[in-house]
From Swiss-Prot:
Subcellular localization: Cytoplasm
Motif placement: 'HIGH' region: 11-21
GO terms, biological process: glutamyl-tRNA aminoacylation
Short motif ('KMSKS' region): ranges: 239-243
Enzyme Commission code: 6.1.1.17
Protein name: Glutamate--tRNA ligase 2
Summary of the function given for this chain in its UniProt record: Catalyzes the attachment of glutamate to tRNA(Glu) in a two-step reaction: glutamate is first activated by ATP to form Glu-AMP and then transferred to the acceptor end of tRNA(Glu).
Binding partners and assembly: Monomer.
Amino acid sequence: MPDQVVTRFAPSPTGFLHIGGARTALFNWLYARGRGGKFLLRIEDTDRARSTPEATAAILQGMAWLGLDHDGEVISQFERAPRHAEVALELLAQGKAYKCFSTQDEIQAFREAAQAEKRSTLFRSPWRDADPATHPDAPYVIRIKAPQSGETVIRDQVQGDVTIRNDQLDDMVLLRSDGTPVYMLAVVVDDHDMGVTHVIRGDDHLNNAARQMMIYQAMGWEVPVWAHIPLIHGPDGKKLSKRHGALGAQEYQAMGYPAAGMRNYLARLGWSHGDDEFFTDAQAREWFDLDGIGKSPARFDLKKLENLSGQHIAVSDDAALRHEIEAYLAAAGLPALTQTQSGDLERAMYCLKDRARTFPELIEKAAFVLASRPISPDEKAAAALASVSDGILAELTPQLQNASWTRESLEEALNAFAEAHGTKFGKLAAPLRAALAGRAVTPSVFDMMLVLGRDESLARLRDAAHPA
């Protein structure tokens, strides 16, 4: 095995980057990055009828959002078809593959007869050991000569040793009659040529591994380390599907989940490091290994995703968070922030991010800094303003005018004002929130006043004291 770890993610471009694929990409990325290796990207676009440029773009965009950078150029499997065919012809020349002239009708007749006689329907070609001199001038496929006795053992890092009797393996087609290679051949040739050392993929590919091993062994190539990871199930224990909610990675971006939270959650979806739930990217790269992957399907839990996302928002750098929120607005098709709003949002981030689980929740709390005068109070805020006389706010404004506009001076001024009116600051907080933000649920009054600054805060208080 080469010294450098090389992993790959090889999606088919027939749709968006779904959650299962995103997790597979993440596991490959973490394993390679944590070992100073390479993470490669191959687009398996051999199915020309279903592969689309739009799907390829969606996959690349989803990976970019998740921060899963790859090494080197994106490999197109379709463009490598001549190389795949070359390997099939090499096996043919070595006597490890053969030309099969059996027609589809003949194969179907063989299987029907086998079924009627209650014997194996596995097709055994009469052309396997035929003298080439007897070959007709007719279309043919190239089949590999599968071993007919013994066992094939898949040494899997997740599933353990999986043993398959060789008499259960057919002589797989490598090259179709039109000269195009089959997927099973293309995967092996590409992985070998790309230097892939570890194949980490869904366990729905486990059955393919035995057939792919035949090609590795026939070519005398080193077999990579296999790690077949369980699929993701919904909360009800059934395979994750549309009815369980959003499936595409970009849908979660548009819903306002931070990429770091999504990476953390996907990493924990089927892999564990002790009891650690929350961890940074650096910790994930350091800790991730194949031994920590469980055999049982993981269940997708939106509440856990929300909780982890909230923790990542809380510890994020303010500028980076503002930048990601702007990307979220674009992904969700929402209006972009103005330059002024962008700067104001970043300044306010310290008092917004502690309790937000998603970007929509954070933006809701940021309404006070994104709004412009005159502030229109919602129903609860209007009720809070109506609970005090306009004169109270009008009287308060000049007293704040001379405050030095620090948290300490504002607290002192507002508490003194409340005491002078025979009440406590808590009684004034609701109308002040309403005046400053037009909402009943906001960051603290002092945080809002500090973020808005003296002039804007006083102007909003005056507006509320003298409504139009």
